[in-house]
């Protein structure tokens, strides 16, 4: 049992419909744990552990599913590395551990899909859009439908409220009469007027918003064998004059096929849980009867601090769904 806000805080409000929650006699909203990663982080905090810890666990998680045939009780086996600063090495250790664990399973084929939320965040940071838009796009990356609505608004420049513009114009005219060196809320009137001129009198052109939106949409469509990931990403960034370069060894895996798994990169993959901050991956396997998602994992460097830790703590892990 955990407090529901621990889950919703970093998994997103949309995730709420999948958890089993109730309110106790003190008004606290509690829920059955929907996964064991957050439970492991809460334990790390409770024990006041300093530095690196490797965790192995097995237990049950409780989550509703869109498929009524799925069980609400999910048995999981997981492994985490918390508090280590060797990010690339740890990412590889987690993926390698996951692959080794497949050796005793019977399956005919499968897919190891890899994404990286950090690359998306870097892209947004480099785009020539107002800071408020950067914050919105990063914050709502996990809410796919709402994120697409934001891209449509970006295309039409519809975030400018005409009512607010009229009020600002009145303030603008009054400020023109004031001393330009006068300070208001930490900025000089001259700075405020310059910003107003840039934002309102010469707003971002609609075609600029369309261009930015198209760049984001095209980026999210990048999907390829893992050995082509750096090549395709760098080609995309160069074509769109974006100052980002991905090294060939950036990804923990470079082979397109490992065991019976095709290894793929997807720029849009990683939108399931809001607490992911870097590398994310999943393994789906097939046998004669069905295709099944057997494992999910990724890096979550901000989860410890968001759950009450005093600082960000590097962490990465994965869990099997049995």
Located regions from the model:
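Positively charged, Gly/Ser-enriched RNA/tRNA-binding surfaces
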Residues: 2-4, 35-49, 55-107, 159-322
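Glycine-rich loop at the start of a catalytic domain that most often binds anionic cofactors/ligands
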Residues: 6-21
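Short terminal or interdomain "cap/linker" segment that borders an active site or interface and mediates
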Residues: 116-117, 121-166
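Hydrophobic alpha-helical transmembrane segments in multi-pass integral membrane proteins
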Residues: 29-33
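Short coil/turn segments at secondary-structure boundaries
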Residues: 53-57, 135-136, 152-154, 267
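Short, glycine/charge-rich beta-strand/loop segments that flank catalytic centers
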Residues: 1-5, 54-64, 111-122, 140
């Amino acid at each position: 049992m955990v407090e529901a806000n621990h889950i919703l805080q970093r998994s997103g409000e949309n995730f709420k419909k999948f958890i089993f929650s109730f309110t106790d006699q003190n008004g606290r909203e509690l829920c059955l744990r929907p996964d064991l990663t957050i439970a492991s982080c809460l334990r790390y905090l409770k024990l006041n552990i300093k530095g690196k810890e490797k965790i192995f666990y097995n237990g049950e998680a409780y989550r509703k599913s869109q498929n009524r045939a799925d069980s609400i009780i999910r048995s999981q086996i997981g492994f985490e590395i918390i508090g280590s600063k060797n990010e690339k090495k740890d990412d590889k250790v987690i993926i390698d551990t996951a692959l080794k664990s497949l050796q005793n399973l019977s399956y005919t084929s499968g897919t190891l899909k890899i994404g990286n939320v950090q690359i998306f965040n870097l892209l947004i940071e480099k785009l020539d859009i107002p800071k408020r838009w950067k914050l919105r796009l990063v914050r709502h990356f996990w809410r796919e439908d709402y994120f697409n609505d934001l891209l449509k608004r970006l295309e039409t420049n519809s975030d400018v409220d005409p009512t607010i513009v009229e009020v600002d114009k009145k303030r603008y005219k009054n400020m023109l009469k004031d001393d330009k060196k006068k300070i208001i809320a930490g900025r000089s009137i001259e700075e405020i007027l310059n910003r107003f001129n840039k934002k309102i009198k010469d707003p971002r052109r609609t075609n600029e918003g369309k261009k930015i939106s198209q760049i984001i949409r095209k980026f999210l469509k990048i999907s390829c064998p893992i050995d082509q990931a750096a090549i395709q990403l760098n080609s995309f960034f160069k074509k769109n004059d974006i100052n980002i370069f991905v090294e060939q060894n950036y990804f923990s895996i470079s082979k397109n096929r490992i065991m019976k798994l095709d290894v793929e990169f997807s720029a849009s993959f990683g939108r399931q849980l809001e607490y992911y901050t870097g590398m994310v991956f999943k393994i789906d396997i097939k046998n004669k009867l069905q295709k099944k998602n057997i494992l999910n994992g990724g890096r979550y460097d901000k989860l410890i601090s968001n759950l009450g830790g005093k600082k960000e703590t590097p962490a990465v892990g994965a869990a099997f769904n049995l």
